């Protein structure tokens, strides 16, 4: 009670302080609001933001004071037309002035962006009272020269093939029906043409349901249909291939609901159905997938909760009535440390804590080691601010991992101390020390191991807040510098051991204006050869041709390492692929000429017509057999056999992660996972050789010997204490490995889909996207955490856990078949590389995804108490000021749990899981968020959350009572749709940008104007 009163006084003081700040003068001729964010407890360091408003109350200029590297101000400008509509949105400029007159701003802006004459985005509106956007120009003169995103507002028509739409429905028995085509004029159609003239259509009915999403490849349609029942429940999603072969089992997502509109049954294409059971509080209590149903015992997964709806236990049982035959997988404890009396916790390694700081938080977890009776025990300790200051976790090697964090005033880590012990092994203690600049940006990361402190990385920023350079091991010799274009897209990485140039609308390839990379060049390691690729794409932005060449013009030694996809099916499954490589000591040619045979989205056979093979065991597809069914799958869509690799069986655990790979010659690869999805061990038995690898947090053992300690920038070899660093490209691919002296130890060159076509040295296994490559026994799988990827085929081996976010695409495809511009950090979702700050991105753990934004958990050690790695620099430093309430909920596909995360980015607990589809997906942020802050919807900030079958989750804000939902079309800069509550449903109120600011005078269209209550469910 005493603590609560203290907190109340604190909030009152803050409110008065904020009021006082808003009355201070900045520019006497304009209205403004000043916000001061304190950076230290004494109030001597702070960041000021001043927002100026015109006479109509519209924000038109924002000044971030002294945030640049030169201690200047960063200023943005928003212009409006005579109708009050937002028009030119100017990129920020650097200025020493407290206020910049618009004319002066516009005259100086080009010099901040390489003298580009159009450093602003510009919407064009139609001449109607609806004020709908018909064109949107991105920043940059090149885009204003005819490369806009165009929007046309149409109606469906039976006389036009591109505007025709089949009228699917659901019978009273729940079956799919086809009722011809919709009559002309019954549907609203939005046609979108991107900067490269790629066309897509969205068809919406009078209820606001999206019934068809159509993408065009020339004149060929790729249609995804959404079919609803009379209660507006989404019952079927028909993939594009369904129009070629009407097979629901192979090409449809199917859903069934109970009388309370809860999804109780669903089926993904090519997989068995899943059942879900709820209690009277609408909580998921039982679920069963296809593999569980196929077991003799008929296993179910059960979920238990406490009185506050927090998940307390999850496991498997033999029926859905009682938890008989229980196998507990995970347990969670909250509020206190009474769990210390239980086995596993009742020892001195888990101290008591009587402070009460853990009240309302997760204080401990137990995760079973799958396939055994062993368990991992974890306890979390908090300070008075609710921050995790200590984590203690047992490990499978008979020891413990203890992490202690000291925070700055702004809740960023100042030091993190990690101690690792294991039975009979050397104790390892490491300390990370973080330093920040005057704008609270990360400036330096130091690492201490064995008492010796070194600098892992130094960071420098340009005046626009972008990372300008990074130096490794405290040496200017190991420095990488970064360059950007007017849109903030990375165009160059330059260093003595690795350089890369990326071209979009420039360079020697066909110019691309929609963000796709048209060509790139690079030079790696000690080589003098400049290598490169030119890229072409189809109308769906899928990679077609990657033409290899050398020199800056990519015009010599062409096609030596080209990789071309010559055909896709409508779901994006690769049908034919050609790959070139080295065939002899000085010869190059076609090494793969592949034809894929598919059964639905699943692969059944691959045939290679190439006569030559890769030289000296190089990367290629190995055509091991010639028979009808070379690949087989289980009821969950997991690959169980790959005869071309000589794999006779692959078995999986309850998380759809492999437990064993068995080869026809008796060789095996065994995997051990925790019930939270953490990989703990692999055992390779190849012939007479056995290699055991233990993953104990960031300490890697090989055959019982401590081998590597992974760091934020590379790793330490524990045999000699030497540091090694990764030099990464724009995707986070490890291109070069150098030692602490700057000597090149490894250089890698990649095909676009991830195969290593040439390398020098092979000192460590982390390669493409920074993922561990298992090449033993010719497996050649990359471990993405949630699933494995086969770069020779350009396919994942198992179904995408987030397949329901990508209805139009095969659940086995890699990165929407655009591997140059996207990556899949955990094997669960696709992220645009331009939306990720790769300079600080650790692909083993960093990803922002899901419920609103999801976080991955780095490893078994760092869950609760770990900062949820920033999607971009400065994210957590600003996001707290834009959340509706303290904290947000995030989901981790890697661990299958949902985590609670505070506005400081620290994971604080486990939240209940829900079982209604579709699963949430990745949220994307841009570089602009480093200077503007990201607004986010949260469950904690909402008094109520309801689900719409196609528009997603609606949140009722505690602060204003309005209902918010993410805008799926995002026309006119809109990121959110905002609704007012009425007796009959939700009525459109305003649109808002991604920062939660209302867009002035942006009028509604007839799409989504009103959402009746019957379309919404809990």
Language-model region placement:
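Bacterial Sec-dependent N-terminal signal peptides
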Residues: 1-28
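Short turn/helix-capping motifs enriched in Asx and small/polar residues
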Residues: 323, 741-755, 777, 785-787, ...
């Amino acid at each position: 009670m005493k603590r609560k009163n203290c907190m109340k006084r604190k909030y009152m003081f803050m409110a008065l302080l904020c009021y006082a700040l808003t009355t201070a003068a900045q520019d006497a001729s304009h209205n403004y609001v000043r916000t001061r964010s304190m950076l230290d407890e004494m109030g001597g360091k702070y960041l000021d933001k001043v927002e100026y408003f015109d006479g109509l109350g519209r924000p038109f200029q924002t000044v971030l004071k002294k945030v640049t590297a030169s201690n200047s101000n960063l200023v943005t400008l928003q212009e409006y037309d005579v109708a009050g509509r937002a028009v030119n949105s100017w990129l920020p400029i650097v200025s020493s002035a407290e206020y910049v007159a618009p004319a002066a701003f516009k005259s100086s802006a080009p010099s901040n962006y390489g003298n580009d004459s159009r450093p602003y985005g510009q919407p064009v509106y139609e001449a109607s009272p609806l004020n709908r956007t018909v064109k949107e120009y991105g920043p940059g003169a090149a885009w204003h020269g005819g490369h806009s995103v165009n929007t046309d507002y149409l109606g469906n028509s039976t006389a036009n093939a591109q505007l025709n739409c089949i009228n699917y429905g659901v019978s009273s028995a729940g079956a799919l029906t086809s009722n011809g085509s919709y009559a002309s004029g019954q549907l609203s159609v939005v046609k979108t043409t991107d900067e490269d003239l790629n066309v897509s259509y969205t068809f919406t009915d009078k209820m606001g349901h999206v019934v068809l999403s159509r993408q065009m490849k020339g004149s060929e349609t790729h249609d995804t249909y959404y079919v609803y029942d009379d209660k507006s429940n989404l019952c079927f999603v028909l993939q594009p291939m369904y129009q070629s072969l009407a097979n629901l089992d192979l090409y449809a997502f199917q859903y069934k609901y109970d009388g309370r509109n809860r999804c109780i049954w669903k089926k993904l294409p090519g997989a068995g159905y899943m059942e879900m059971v709820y209690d009277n509080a609408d909580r998921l209590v039982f679920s069963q997938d296809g593999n569980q149903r196929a077991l003799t015992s008929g296993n179910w997964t059960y979920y238990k909760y406490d009185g506050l709806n927090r998940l307390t236990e999850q496991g498997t049982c033999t029926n859905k009535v009682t938890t008989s035959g229980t196998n507990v997988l995970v347990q969670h404890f909250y509020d206190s440390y009474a769990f210390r009396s239980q086995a596993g916790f009742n020892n001195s390694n888990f101290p008591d804590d009587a402070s009460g700081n853990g009240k309302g938080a997760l204080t401990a977890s137990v995760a079973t080691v799958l396939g055994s009776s062993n368990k991992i025990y974890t306890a979390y300790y908090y300070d008075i601010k609710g921050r995790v200051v200590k984590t203690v976790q047992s490990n499978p090697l008979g020891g413990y991992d203890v992490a202690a964090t000291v925070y700055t005033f702004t809740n960023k880590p100042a030091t993190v101390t990690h101690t690792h012990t294991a039975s009979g092994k050397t104790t390892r203690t490491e300390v990370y020390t973080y330093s920040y600049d005057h704008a609270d940006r990360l400036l330096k990361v130091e690492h201490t191991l064995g008492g010796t402190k070194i600098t892992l990385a130094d960071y420098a920023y340009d005046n626009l807040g972008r990372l300008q350079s990074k130096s490794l091991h405290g040496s200017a010799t190991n420095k990488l510098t970064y360059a950007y274009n007017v849109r903030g897209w990375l165009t160059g990485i330059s260093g003595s051991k690795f350089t890369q140039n990326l071209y979009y609308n420039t360079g020697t390839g066909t110019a691309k204006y929609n963000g796709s990379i048209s060509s790139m060049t690079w030079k790696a390691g000690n080589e003098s050869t400049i290598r490169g690729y030119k890229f072409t794409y189809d109308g769906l932005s899928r990679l077609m041709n990657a033409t290899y060449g050398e020199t800056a013009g990519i015009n010599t030694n062409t096609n030596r390492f080209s990789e071309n996809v010559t055909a896709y099916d409508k779901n994006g499954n690769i049908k034919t692929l050609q790959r070139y490589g080295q065939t002899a000591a000085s010869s190059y040619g076609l090494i793969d000429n592949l034809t894929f045979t598919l059964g639905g989205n699943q692969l059944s056979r691959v045939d290679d017509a190439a006569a030559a093979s890769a030289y000296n065991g190089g990367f290629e597809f190995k055509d091991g057999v010639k028979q009808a069914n070379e690949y087989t799958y289980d009821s969950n869509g997991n690959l169980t056999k790959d005869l071309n690799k000589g794999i006779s069986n692959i078995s999986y655990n309850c998380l759809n992660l492999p437990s064993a790979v068995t080869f026809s010659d008796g060789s095996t690869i065994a995997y051990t996972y925790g019930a939270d999805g953490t990989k703990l061990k692999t055992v390779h038995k190849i012939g007479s050789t056995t290699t055991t690898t233990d993953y104990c947090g960031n300490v890697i053992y090989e055959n019982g010997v401590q081998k590597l300690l992974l760091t934020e920038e590379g790793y330490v070899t524990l045999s000699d204490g030497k540091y090694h660093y990764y030099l990464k490209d724009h995707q986070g691919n490890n291109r070069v490995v150098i030692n602490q002296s700057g000597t090149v130890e490894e250089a890698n060159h990649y095909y676009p889909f991830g195969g290593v076509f040439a390398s020098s040295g092979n000192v460590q296994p982390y390669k493409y996207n920074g993922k561990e490559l298992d090449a033993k026994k010719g497996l050649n799988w990359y471990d993405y955490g949630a699933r494995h990827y086969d770069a020779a085929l350009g396919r994942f081996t198992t179904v995408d856990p987030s397949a329901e976010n990508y209805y139009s695409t095969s659940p086995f495809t890699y990165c929407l078949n655009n591997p140059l511009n996207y990556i899949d950090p955990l094997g669960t979702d696709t992220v645009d590389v331009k939306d990720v700050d790769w300079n600080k991105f650790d692909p083993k753990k960093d990803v922002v995804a899901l419920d609103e934004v999801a976080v991955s958990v780095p490893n078994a050690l760092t869950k609760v108490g770990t900062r949820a790695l920033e999607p971009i620099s400065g994210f957590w430093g600003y996001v707290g000021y834009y959340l509706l309430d303290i904290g947000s909920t995030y989901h981790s596909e890697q661990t299958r749990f949902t985590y609670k995360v505070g506005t400081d980015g620290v994971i604080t607990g486990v939240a209940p899981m829900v079982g209604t589809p579709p699963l949430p997906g990745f949220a994307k942020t841009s570089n602009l968020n480093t200077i503007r802050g990201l607004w986010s919807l949260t469950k904690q900030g909402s008094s109520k959350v309801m689900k719409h079958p196609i528009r997603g989750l609606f949140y009722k804000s505690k602060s204003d009572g309005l209902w918010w939902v993410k805008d799926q079309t995002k026309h006119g800069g809109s990121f959110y749709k905002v609704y007012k509550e009425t007796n009959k449903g939700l009525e459109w109120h305003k649109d808002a940008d991604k920062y939660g600011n209302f867009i002035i005078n942006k009028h509604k269209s007839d799409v989504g104007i009103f959402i009746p209550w019957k379309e919404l469910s809990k």
